[in-house]
Regions:
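Structured core of small recognition/catalytic domains
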Residues: 178-247, 256-263, 267-268, 274
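Conserved N-terminal glycine/acidic-rich loop preference
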Residues: 17, 34-36, 59-66, 102-108
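A short acidic, glycine-rich active-site loop
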Residues: 54-64, 196-202
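Structural beta-alpha unit
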Residues: 1-2, 15, 56, 72-105, ...
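Glycine-rich, Arg-bearing micro-motifs that act as flexible, cationic patches
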Residues: 107-126, 244-270
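Hydrophobic alpha-helical segments and helix pairs
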Residues: 102-146
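Short, flexible loop segments at boundaries between secondary-structure elements
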Residues: 273-285
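Small/aliphatic-rich secondary-structure junction motif
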Residues: 1-52, 150-195, 212-222, 244, ...
Length: 291
């Protein structure tokens, strides 16, 4: 696969079309192309079979929805390099294996199944929980902008990854946004403070490096937000005016794939902004080993 394109999964649903909009903007910011894909397990068995010309055939319908999505992306970001492809596999397998590696995969939160959250449960959630590259889930929610400056939120958990911090910093720089590092803990404020210090220090260094390469005067700020209490409540509140929330998935010995945890799961289901899930390892300890 080409690695110079943002990838967006398309199924023709309103949610996936919102994902196309978001992905087109993201590709434009990054100076990348946009690859629009649709997964169809039937295509695996029908490759090489001549199209019968039936305008109602699945193959024709897939071509139509990809064309419509590509046209939408072109109208949103004229001149963006676009490619379309039908992946001959069931969706989860296609998106996890066929697209590896990818700089970024964008998905809608709700597909054609008709039940709220069905696609998120059956495809988006499984892909986000197992992917080794960043996955952004875009919800059908109107984005509220009540802050004077743009905001990217980095949600800290007990196993926060350096990769998630790096991705959040990158997004803040691309969007000319401040980075809000948010952490809530049920108990143990000392450990929570230590984690916050580690992440903020790392993010500040990354932002300083990025700022040295910027040609304009904007400089992103790192804002700390921590509180004792239920993490879900605090994070959902902070997500209201955010352009993006970034969460980290971690590997748990004895389990296959990555672990999202209940808080990250809740963010994917309910956060009123796009949510990026970034795989990675915890920050190294002083000895250089993963904590």
């Amino acid at each position: 696969m080409e690695i110079d394109s943002v990838v967006v999964a398309v199924d023709g649903s309103p949610s996936s079309l919102l994902a196309v909009d978001w992905a087109a903007d993201e590709a434009f910011r990054r100076g990348l192309g946009l690859r629009l894909v649709h997964a169809s397990v039937r295509e695996r068995y029908e490759r090489g079979v001549e199209d019968d010309g039936d305008p109602g055939s699945e193959r024709k319908l897939i071509q139509e929805l990809l064309f419509t999505a590509a046209e939408r992306a072109e109208l949103r970001r004229p001149g963006l390099e676009l490619t379309t492809e039908v992946l001959a596999a069931e969706p989860v397998t296609a998106l996890l294996e066929t697209l590896r590696p990818a700089p970024l995969l964008v998905m809608g939160s709700r597909g054609r199944g008709g039940f709220h959250g069905l696609l998120l449960g059956s495809v988006s959630l499984r892909v986000a929980a197992r992917s080794t590259y960043p996955v952004v889930v875009v919800r059908e929610v109107g984005q509220q902008r009540d802050s004077p400056r743009r905001r990217v939120v980095l949600a800290l958990g007990p196993h926060e990854a350096a990769a998630a911090t790096g991705f959040a910093v990158e997004e803040a720089v691309l969007r000319r946004a401040d980075l809000h590092v948010v952490h809530a803990w049920p108990d143990g404020p000392e450990a929570a403070a230590a984690l916050m210090d580690t992440v903020v220090e790392h993010a500040t260094k990354l932002l300083a490096t990025a700022s040295a390469q910027q040609t304009d005067s904007f400089r992103a700020a790192v804002v700390r937000m921590s509180a004792q209490g239920p993490p879900t409540d605090l994070l959902l509140h902070e997500a209201v005016s955010a352009e993006l929330m970034v969460v980290g998935a971690h590997r748990n010995p004895g389990h296959l794939g990555l672990q999202l945890g209940p808080v990250n799961h809740a963010m994917l289901l309910y956060a009123p902004c796009p949510v990026a899930v970034v795989a990675g390892t915890p920050f190294p300890d002083e000895s250089g080993h993963a904590a």
